[in-house]
Amino acid sequence: MPFKHALCNEIYKDWDFREACKSIRSFGYTGIEIAHFTLADEPQSISQEKRREYRQIMQDEDLTFVGLHWVMVAPPGLHVTTPDTALREKSWDHIRHLIDLCADLGPDGVMVFGSPLQRRSTGGSTREEATKRFVDGLAAVAPQAESRGVTILPEALSPQQSDVLQSLDEAAEIVRQIGSPAVQTMFDSHNAVDEVEPHDKLIERHFDLI
């Protein structure tokens, strides 16, 4: 079975959306992964009319909407594991808005949750405390994601990027802990360079969650 290829659209940030889709398709890609800040910093500011327009453009240009990524880059200042309760709740509200945007842009979308700067421990928190807040936040938004047909993918990142979820084993552990079909994980060949086990072994062990 041949792989399908999608392109992340942040390289087209200042382009007209239709022209960006035309360009992506012209290079042979069949899918598009959207960074929401290319549309608006705050997803809730995107009207339903614009969401329908974006969805129709992707259909017109024969591109499959894969999902969203770079979910915490904008607006600035967000952080999902901070001990600051007000900021943490604001940040998870942002994720809730993104879930709705993702569902409105196309069916069966995924949200790749990398964003190392906005999830790593901060404010004097330990790695364990930050990880617990991350798990609690994901568990809290999972019912909404499930009801909207969106799958959130917490991504394992190298220790140089974040101290929260540094391996596929750790990502799989929290996915199983949450126990929602709307929270799975992913295998990223770039971010897997620091894994200590062969990649094929990791994929075999966690294939049901990837």
What are these regions (language model features)?
Residues R18-F37, L105-G106:
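Catalytic domains of carbohydrate-active enzymes, especially glycoside hydrolases
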Residues Y29, L63, P107-D108, I210:
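A structural motif
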Residues N9-F17, F37-K50, R119-T122, P159-L165, ...:
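Acidic-and-aromatic substrate-binding clefts and catalytic sites of carbohydrate-active enzymes
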Residues F3-N9, I32-I34, F65-W70, M111-F113, ...:
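Hydrophobic faces of well-ordered beta-strands that scaffold small-molecule active sites
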Residues S45-D62, G67:
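Aromatic-lined substrate-binding rim segments of carbohydrate-active enzymes
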Residues R18-E19, I57-E61, G77-T185, D194:
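Active-site acidic/histidine proton-transfer and metal-coordination neighborhood
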Residues G28-T30, I178-Q184, R205-I210:
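Glycine-enriched alpha-helix->loop->beta-strand junction motifs that scaffold or abut catalytic
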Residues C21, V196-I210:
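A short alpha/beta connector and helix-capping loop motif
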